[in-house]
């Protein structure tokens, strides 16, 4: 942007020292890191680790760390807020089990203490989620001869426990949904 180049103006044909060159390239890399942060965060929220990994593909470590600190200071990057939003999205929209959500949060680089705090403060009832899933997504599959077995297997692969699945089927059979 124009402010950056106005700040770092050099006359045509002017020779610069190695130190000036290094300082200029450092400023350019920092600006590149900041611009990349804004670009990535404008698309979706990221954890600090996710953003750091993406920045390190194109920017050096020093400027990556500086840019991340700036995003944290501005409030654009907050792992706790990101974790709460992720839990809400994965549990409500994607209908995932608590254990699968925990695994996904680890994968995205959220600190273990933030994961446990977020999952404690958020009430996720796997049985309610399962009842909803079974009645919407799996209802037709239950009509098949081995439907119960296939649905149970599918739900277990999604991270739900056999106990929770059985409880959900019992609630459906008893009309408690």
Residue ranges and their predicted role:
Residues 1-177:
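An alpha-helical, amphipathic repeat domain used for nucleic-acid recognition
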């Amino acid at each position: 942007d124009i402010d950056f180049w106005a700040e770092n103006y050099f006359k045509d044909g002017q020779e610069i020292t190695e130190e000036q060159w290094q300082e200029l390239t450092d400023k350019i890399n920092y600006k590149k890191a900041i611009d990349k942060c804004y670009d990535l965060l404008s698309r979706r929220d990221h954890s600090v680790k996710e953003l750091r990994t993406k920045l390190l593909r194109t920017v050096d470590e020093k400027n990556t760390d500086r840019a991340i600190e700036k995003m944290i200071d501005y409030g654009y990057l907050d792992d706790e807020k990101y974790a709460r939003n992720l839990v809400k999205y994965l549990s409500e929209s994607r209908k995932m089990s608590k254990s699968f959500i925990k695994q996904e949060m680890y994968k995205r680089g959220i600190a273990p203490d933030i994961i446990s705090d977020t999952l404690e403060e958020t009430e996720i009832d796997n049985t309610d989620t399962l009842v909803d899933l079974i009645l919407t997504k799996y209802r037709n599959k239950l009509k098949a001869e081995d439907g119960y077995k296939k649905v149970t297997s599918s739900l277990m692969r999604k991270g739900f426990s056999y106990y929770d699945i059985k409880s959900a089927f019992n609630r459906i059979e008893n009309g408690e949904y």
